[in-house]
Amino acid sequence: MSYLKHIRQDLQDMQAYTVQNATGMVKLDAMENPFPLPEQLQALLGEQLGKVAVNRYPGSRIEDLKHAIAQHVGLPAAYGLMLGNGSDELISLLSMACQMPGASVLAPEPGFVMYAMSAKLQGLHYIPVPLRDDFELDEPAMVDAIRTHQPAIVYLAYPNNPTANLWDVAVIKRLIAQVSAYGGWVVMDEAYQPFSPETWLHEIKRDPHANAQVLLMRTLSKFGLAGVRIGYMLGRANVIAQLDKIRPPYNISVLNAECALFALSHAQVFEQQAADICHERVRVSQQLATMAGVTVFPSQANMFLIRLQGDENVATRVFEALRQKHILVKNVSKMHRVLHHCLRITVGTSSENDQFLAALQEVLA
């Protein structure tokens, strides 16, 4: 008897999402905010969490959190907001909501792996469209794929992961118009917005009619709360009301909600951390640009890509050599053709970044 008899074969054929062991490492692999909660706030948060009624299901504090986020982002009139247990859950709920015979999801690649995984798990056809070699959207290929498949959802990460760039606004506007014409949805994924000079929310407010079929998704992970798992999505109130029907009723724990409310009440602390990260991003990029055999690409996120000169295995060798020096980065060189010879590095603290730069210099010597 097979113990896997009733487990879907396509699920058995998938590869599980893996998290690297970071014990004892300088952790620069997961685009986290590297700064812990300041000591002066730790006691305050502990006191606040100690008062939470953990014996009760989440109640009115979830609505308080939605209101706080709406104020924080400047939610447009006639728009609604829904919460997810991280953006991952929101992506899964979108796939579930659009699961109909023949429905499809489209996204540029390389991109966030959960777009494809969630679509496939819900039985949706997934359509990847490769980026150009310069990491820009291939507009003719996107237009052709959208015309052919009319996907229910088109994901556009702004900035993109792992390439860390913002795509051309004019191209995005034309794609939104094309998808909107047949009633599809464009999801602008702004996970890395705290480190970016741009947000599509400005376009939504400037021209709500042209962006009526746009959903905007963000997370508090990059804000500084990766361990709290809070994602949120903005859209027309009538649309969010429909999507919210499939959200599990208690998907946000009372402790997570309280942590998020606390963080938003001290938003200036996290905004300063984001500014410090952006400053470090510039400094580290400038240092990398001076290293022989290293190409560093522009970034509008809390990460950047470097391309190493050498044979097809150079990125793997450098990745392993850095790991031996207790520096953990992300080897993306085999993820997609356009990422050949590439490593992705999270911007850490000044000390962490200095350790990375010194280790890389030694490895390349």
What do the predicted segments below correspond to?
Residues 278, 291-325, 343:
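Conserved PLP-binding catalytic core of the aspartate aminotransferase-like
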